[in-house]
Amino acid sequence: EFGVSDEESLWLEKSKSELPNYAFLVEDLLEQGYELIPITSPNYPRTLKNNLKKTYAPTLIYTKGNKQLLQENSIAIVGSRQAGGDSLSFTDVIAKQAVYNKKIIVSGYAKGVDKQALDSAIKYGGKSIVVLPQGITTFSSGFKSLYKEIISGRVLVLSVFHPKASWNAGLAMARNPIIYGMASEIFVAESDSKGGTW
């Protein structure tokens, strides 16, 4: 009647039956201080929507921290997890300049360049957006180490994955376009030929 295939009909039925579970999950997330920002919200990052367009921009993001950071001018510093000293020094210099120019630093919280970018942003009194390769509720150790920065409004943590999704390499690769999409400028400190930077 509505031009829906049998497969789509089954999917709709399954989705309908799972709605109560998602309602409880959303309520639980809100009680824990997380925010859910759909692509239709004015709080959704404009840069992400403009860079990835509606075709690729995630329809929903999960955040914790100062959501005003989502609308500020930002740069991304990306590179190898096994970055050498020169690359980490380069990252530190770029981060320092970004803080001076009042730009947000977007990073992925991986070791190497990502972690250096975040640490330098904090060291120089700047602000940062951390884009997770996992669900936002599985980042408990990270929330503990960044507690002071999150509370003070200097760091926002963001995920586009199911809130309970554990880290895996596939999510780490899928996270990278979000980092690029969040930034107006991208600096590559070091990239391995077999790595996941690109």
PLM region descriptions:
Residues 31-32, 39-198:
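Glycine-biased, small-residue-rich flexible motifs in mid-sequence functional cores and linkers
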